[in-house]
């Protein structure tokens, strides 16, 4: 039987894609199992090389003839870590400069106006890509009748290095994401999508990027709703901090006060090697983040939310996993055998003279935890939970409806030591628990389909303009949180972290 590939007629030119059938068991009886049309590796901007390195993206030009869109484009230049290899079923890639592409999943390239969901991947602003197997959008498109888009954007030194003689540097990766959203506005109707119903969603650095977008005036109107998984508005960098990072990179390159033109002439591999040397020298786990004070991101996102000067979506869904930091602390040999005094010593960096009281509080909340797990719980709140609470408060004050969740299902990996760690919810959101790589992260757990379908459906409902669950109220002074789990603790919980918040000087 001769099956012709799907074709999309976009304003930039024609695209030839592939047809993909969904797979996996049906947990809740709503799976359509209809095939979807997939278009991969679509350029949304020119390759950021030469004078475009560190500069804002330049939109991709139109083309003539039929363009093949059957292969993912290369990732942004990077040195993948352990998690990225697991996410993609073990594949290792270092990427290429010509990386500014996106991918589209749709049930049909017709005249329907389906909701659109644009995924921004995580990876500490250093790694990742839109073609990772966990991010396959087939289930969203087939079951939820949404058009699913994943994107690549510049990472690390290429996306977030601040240079004094390049005024738009420091936010190039964020500008890439916004340019991809402009592409969606101009082209998504050709894939059966509605440019007026765009939901942007992401995890970790992807969610943190969305948090930054909430402070970008030029992003207003590019998306209507936002979903922020394990990231809020706290991960931005001042210009002074950014200058220090630039100096560290220049030291690693053996340069003093390098200009943008000098750095544009250095091979990408050499810049990556210098970046890796920076990481080995210690310091921040997020050495590159969007930089404040430029034309794209003039003020802190929380201030922009309060002032009404940023993107201002109509609604936000956001949350965390229960044990975020265990993804990192479970492998930390320095925590093996740590005692209470050791945790207090670490806590002084954040809490000063009150460190002992804070550690005592967390120990009383988690009496069965070992001291390493107590420390991990404190860091989970510091890095993820408290910023999520701050975001919820800012949105409530600004009159933007928001819903908060916690994902509490623990992976059995490493004998259960990782718990419900950072990133573990991703295959559940995409309903891809059977994708290659997911089993490495989820361990030998069985019967995950129902929880996966529930979480996927909540995201689909939200993209269609509804509350994520009929019994899940928007945030108010009672701080409702929806707990995702496959046991009897699942469902609505009111203000589950009131005691923890007390030691972070929040009400």
Residues of each region from the PLM?
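Non-catalytic accessory segments of hydrolases
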Residues: 1-171, 440-455, 461-470, 488, ...
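Mobile gating loops/cap/lid regions near enzyme active sites that modulate substrate access
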Residues: 74, 79-80, 385-507
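Alpha/beta-hydrolase fold nucleophile elbow
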Residues: 115, 191-203
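Active-site loop->helix "elbow" adjoining a glycine-rich segment at hydrolase catalytic centers
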Residues: 122, 172-176, 204-207
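Substrate-access "cap/lid" subdomains that shape
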Residues: 186, 220, 229-345, 374-397
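Short glycine-enriched nucleophile-adjacent loop
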Residues: 207-219
């Amino acid at each position: 039987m001769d099956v012709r590939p799907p074709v999309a007629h976009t304003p930039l030119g024609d695209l030839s894609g592939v047809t993909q059938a969904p797979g996996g068991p049906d947990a809740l009886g709503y799976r359509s199992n209809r095939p979807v049309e997939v278009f991969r590796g679509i350029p949304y901007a020119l390759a950021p090389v030469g004078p475009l390195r560190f500069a804002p993206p330049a939109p991709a030009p139109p083309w003539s003839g039929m363009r093949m869109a059957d292969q993912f484009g290369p990732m942004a230049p990077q040195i993948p870590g352990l998690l990225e290899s697991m996410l993609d079923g073990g594949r290792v890639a270092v990427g290429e400069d010509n990386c500014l592409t996106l991918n589209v999943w749709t049930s049909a390239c017709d005249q329907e106006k389906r909701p659109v969901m644009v995924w921004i991947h995580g990876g500490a602003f250093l790694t990742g890509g839109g073609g990772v197997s966990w991010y396959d959008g087939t289930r969203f498109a087939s079951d939820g009748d949404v058009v699913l888009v994943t994107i690549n954007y510049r990472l690390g030194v290429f996306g977030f290095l601040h240079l004094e003689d390049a005024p738009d540097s420091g936010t190039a990766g964020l500008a890439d994401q916004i340019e991809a959203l402009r592409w969606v506005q101009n082209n998504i109707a050709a894939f059966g999508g509605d440019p007026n119903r765009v939901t942007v969603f992401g995890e970790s650095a992807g969610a943190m990027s969305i948090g930054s977008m909430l402070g970008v005036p030029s992003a207003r109107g590019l998306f209507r709703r936002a979903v922020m998984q394990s990231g809020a508005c706290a991960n931005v960098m001042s210009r002074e901090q950014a200058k220090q990072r630039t100096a560290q990179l220049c030291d690693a390159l053996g340069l003093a006060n390098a200009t943008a033109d000098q750095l544009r002439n250095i091979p990408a591999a050499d810049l990556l090697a210098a970046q890796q040397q920076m990481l080995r020298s210690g310091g921040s786990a997020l050495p590159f983040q969007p930089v404040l004070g430029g034309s794209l991101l003039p003020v802190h996102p929380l201030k922009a939310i309060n002032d009404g000067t940023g993107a201002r979506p109509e609604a936000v869904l956001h949350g965390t996993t229960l044990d975020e930091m265990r993804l990192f602390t479970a492998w930390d040999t320095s925590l093996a055998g740590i005692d209470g005094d050791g945790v207090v010593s670490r806590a002084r960096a954040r809490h000063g003279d009150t460190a002992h009281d804070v550690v005592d509080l967390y120990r009383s909340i988690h009496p069965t935890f070992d001291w390493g797990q107590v420390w991990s719980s404190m860091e989970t709140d510091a890095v993820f939970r408290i910023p999520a609470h701050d975001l919820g408060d800012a949105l409530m004050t600004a009159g933007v409806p928001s819903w908060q969740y916690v994902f509490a299902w623990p992976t059995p990996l490493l004998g259960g030591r990782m718990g419900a760690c950072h990133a573990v919810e991703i295959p559940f959101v995409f309903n891809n628990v059977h994708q290659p790589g997911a089993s490495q992260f989820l361990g030998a757990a069985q019967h995950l389909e129902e929880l996966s379908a529930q979480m996927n459906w909540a995201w689909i409902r939200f993209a269609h303009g509804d509350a994520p669950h009929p019994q899940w109220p928007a945030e108010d002074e009672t701080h409702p949180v929806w707990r995702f789990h496959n046991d009897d603790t699942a469902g609505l919980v009111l203000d589950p972290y009131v005691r923890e918040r007390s030691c972070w000087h929040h009400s």
